Structures are given as C-alpha cells and as structure tokens.
Amino acid sequence: MDVHMVDQVLARYKCGSNTAVRFKLVQCHKDILDNGKEFHPSFSHQFFGDKSILTAMNISAFYSARYDLHLYYHGGSLLTYMGLKHDGEVNSKVVDGVQPDPVLSVIAEKYPAGCMTNLDEFIAKLPEEAKFMPMGELLHSYKCNDTEYEIYKADVTTPRLKDYHERLQTFLLFEKRKEAGDTHYSIVGYMTVYQYYAYPDKIRPRISQMLILPPFQKQGHGAQLLLTVDKFYVQDPQVLDITVEDPSYDFMRLRDYVDALRCRDLSVFSPENIRNGFSDRMVAQARKELKINKVQCRRVYEILRLRVTDLSNAEEYKSFRLGVKNRLNVPFQKEKADIEKLKVLLKPEEFSATATLQSTQERIQYLDQLYQELEEHYKKTIERIAAV
C-alpha cells in the first residue's frame, strides 16, 4: 500500500486528543453515569506532543473511528480511574504495520500515585473515599450559589500532602456539600506558590501555577483564591512583594481585577492623586500595604486612571493615552540604545547581519495596536469592578 493510501486509511483512526480525553469529578456511582459532569482538557500537548493527534491505542489493533479515554477522579481524594472505550478494532495489517501510539502507558507515566483500570473496583472504593477531609490550614470560607467553599494552605510538612500533591498541587480550594447528613468535599482548584530570597532580608513569594477546574470556572472562585493568597502574605512582615511566574493572559486579567479592587481603597489611589499621575508614593504604599510590586502597581494605576478619565474630554483622554504609550515604548527605546552600542562594537558586515530594528512607522503602528488591546482589557476590568 502506498504512503498516500496509508494516510487515507489512518485518517479514519485519528482524532484530537483534546476531544478524545474525557474527565469527570465523581463522588458516587451516579456521577459516573452523568455526562453533564464531563469536561475535556484545553491543552494535551504535554502528554502527546505538539500535534496533539492520537492514532492507534493498541499494539495489535487500531480502534475504529470513535474512541474515548476516560479519566475519573474522586472529587475529594482524587483517586483515579483510567479506561478506554471504542466502537471496534481494525487489524494493524490494513495500515502496513504502522505502530500505534501507546496512549495508556503515556498517560500512566504522568500519574506517579497510580491509576485504577477496573471500573467496578473504582466504584466499590467511592464510599470509603467519601470520608476524605482536606489537609492543611483553613484560611478562608465563602458561599457561592448557596454552596460553601473552603480554601486551605498546605506545605511540604503537611501530613498527606505529598501523595495528594502528586495528584494535584497547593493552596487548595474545595467545594463543601452536605448530603444525607454527611459532609463531602470536592476539589475546585489550586495555586502553587514558591518563596524566593529578596535582598537584603526579605522573601518574595512567586505564584507558579493556578487552576480552577472547568466545572467551576466563571463563578468567581479564581478571584476568591487569589484574594486569599494575597491576604495570607500581606500579614507576613518578611514578605517584600508578590510576583507571578510567566502569567497567562487569563491570569493577568484576574490579577489586574483583584489588585485594582484592592488598591482603589488606598488613599494614594484617590481620584485626585490618580489624576496627578503615577508616583513613587503609589509604589511604596501598594508594596507596604498590599505586597504589590512596582510593575503591577503601574498597571493598576493605569486601570484606575482610565476609570476616572472622562473619555469625552479630548485633553484628558489624550493625556491618559500618552502616559500608557510612553510606558509601552520603553522597551523599544532600550532596544534602540542597544543597537547603537552594537553599531560601535561590530564591523559593518557583522552589524548588518545581526541587528534588526523596526522603522519608526512600524514601531508606531505596533505601539498603537498594543495600546488598543490594553485599553480594551482595562475597560473590561473596570466593568467587572463596577459590578462588585
């Protein structure tokens, strides 16, 4: 069989891994039967490679066009079941001996705490798993849609955390429900924070990971978790400020909202002070009172400045735009200065081969695009603040 024909045959037995993988958080047998509890991963390339396309899942046979990989977690303990469902099999000889992807073993490697593969045995364990209780120190509780939620802090010294951390990771947010007089916990999300040294005698916590599971997203849990973590570190005099490791766009939106909400009540961020421009006093008070670093403080200032800016007043609006664009232009000015240094150090042919600098017109267009995107983001943040 030629390569083209093999590709045509294989195409029937491929599907995107984001579609094939199906998660469920379950508490009892009926949850396993409830398709409404199912959700898919947003990203799976960490498991299957950048293409995130699955082919065969069995050494001797390919499964037919539909196959589903089920990953069920007990909502509290995260006891895990992994299973495969498919419509039928195709002999691998049909595709000229092309070897299948070892999907089950690939996933199993990512679960050091292990997975169950017998569904009946998994179901039989659920009543015992219902006795799960969160570990660590209770920091905060709140209600959302008549359901109670609790946030716990745990670290490497916390009993039971090591095994649990292998299944998840550590500021832990749980849903708390009562059924038939019994309390049941279900994991909602988590945040991992590492502490680094800050010269000369301080600590700088760095938020490394944050996740709110899909069934609980868009309900305000992310803001509750971040506010709780911020409050925890604000009380520690050893903490200089809080940073974030490589934040995603969604996390930046959340952080901007939470920090703007916190800063708007500080005297230094009063409308009068905001209109006078960004100041060192803002940086100092935001760091002292809320552990917000200078870079984030500037973003918060811009959000609150736009909030008090009369967009129908041409001069006010222009002043705001220029202030933001000047900040956005700083990296370009630094790049220009670096290019000038290279021009002195390198030979003409070396310089022309290594140095690239946008034209003034290109830079202006790019800055304008950056500004428009940022203003739109700031406006959405302001709308969310107004809704509180």
Across the structure, where does each feature detected by a protein language model lie?
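Extended, composition-driven regions rather than compact fold-specific motifs
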Residues: M1-P205, K231-V388
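A broad, structure-centric signal for solvent-exposed, well-ordered loop/edge residues
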Residues: P200, P214, Q219-G220, F251
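Conserved acetyl-CoA-binding loop-helix of GNAT-fold acetyltransferases
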Residues: I212, K218-K231
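Hydrophobic adenine-recognition pocket in adenosine-nucleotide-binding enzymes
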Residues: M210-P215, P247
